[in-house]
Amino acid sequence: MVVRSNGWRPAPGSGLWMMDRRQALKSMAAATGCVMAAAVGCGGGGQTTTPPTTPTPPSLPVGVFNPTSADLSFLDALEQQGCLYFWEQASPVTGQVLDHAANNLSGQIDPSTTQASIAATGFGLTALCIADQRGYLTGATHTQIVARVQTTLSFHLNNMQNKNGFFYHFNDVNTGAPLSGSEVSSIDTAWLMCGVLAARAYFNDATITSLATQLYERVNWPWMLNGGQTFAQAWYPSTAANPGFSSSRYDTYCELMALYLLAIGSPTYPIAATYWVNIARPTLTYEGYTYISSNSDPLFTHQWSHAWFDFRTNSDAYTNYFTNSIYATQAHETFCLMTYPNWYTESYWGITSSDYVGGYTAWGGPPEQGPIDGTVVPCAAAGSLAFLPNECLEVLEALKSNWGAKAWGRYGFVDAFNSNSSPKWYNTDCLGIDLGISVLMAENVRTGLVWSTFMSNPEPGSAMQLAGFH
């Protein structure tokens, strides 16, 4: 059985959903060729530490992005078909977006699953802003798009189960009822709120503004701290095997920046800006690239917060996180080409948490992690389009050109495929979160629309200022 989105898998024979993304990451050991420095921050609880020096730039600067008309046509296709997923694979009654769906459908919502994801819905709300701006949904008017956003926000505010404003990760797409085994998720609520705020700023509609503001201001961020120095990853209801807050914390640098900044910027339930320094920030050196990175996190951890928060020209006491993600992407490309030269080339590289022939895995590097087998995950390159546009676009265009007959469908790329295996393997599904990061970063590298829209809300900029960005 293929494991679905974001580290969750169905427990064999139980019908329950189990979280294994972070468990998988924690179990992966460091490989040779990487040097991990001591954590920077106060993640262990209040130590005084010295911020790292700014990473040394590589010898070759990042190139200027001057896309050709063919490049723009490709990006249009990637964005338009990705946006179509968030229109067709969402319930018109609840607005929830399916976590995953087959990539060979003809316009109907996938009948084989009812699993919606609040993270996919957050990406979807943002994708609808892009779709409206570019006129991508030829079968939907602006009025219809606004109505869908209103429906989505209203249903989440008034009909979805929540705990102090935090939502269950996976819910029934038709009813909103939490799926058995699902957790109340801190980070996935953050992705939903990013989409909520993006929609509030973009549509400038009184109903959307009211609903979005109520949703964001209802989240009781301090509650998810559970008295600790960092956020708990989840809370489980009394029906779970281990009810209450999870012992796992968002205490080390990863995709967590959006979570902390949304909490710091909250006008109703803020956390103190001092929690920003409680995050441990280990540094990794690989082949001359030095950057902040956990010892076991895939490439998406350097991408997702950047889809909404604009870190390009701002640094805090530790680093410029946009530059940090450039180095992380360069290191990942180098890792693929140097470690597996028989599989990966300059036009075929990029792995991050995804489905694969054996189910689901959180894989990547450096350091090497997971059962790397020559599979490529298109959203790894797509999610880094804003960081290395030329290199990533080369990969994406080649993937479509060379393997598009099976790797590209109604909504763009399938989640992953392996052109090196015998027989070749192609996933038949696409995942909402992976299409989402691809669409958002493609638009950001072209126009910066998501950045400028999201950052026009007062809360993100205020949070960054409070956290010490300048």
Please name every model-derived segment.
Residues G43-T49:
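Bacterial lipoprotein signal-peptidase II cleavage site
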Residues T49-S59:
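Intrinsically disordered, low-complexity proline-rich regions
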Residues M1-V40:
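N-terminal secretory signal peptides
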Residues L60-H470:
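Ser/Thr/Asn(+Pro)-rich, low-complexity disordered segments
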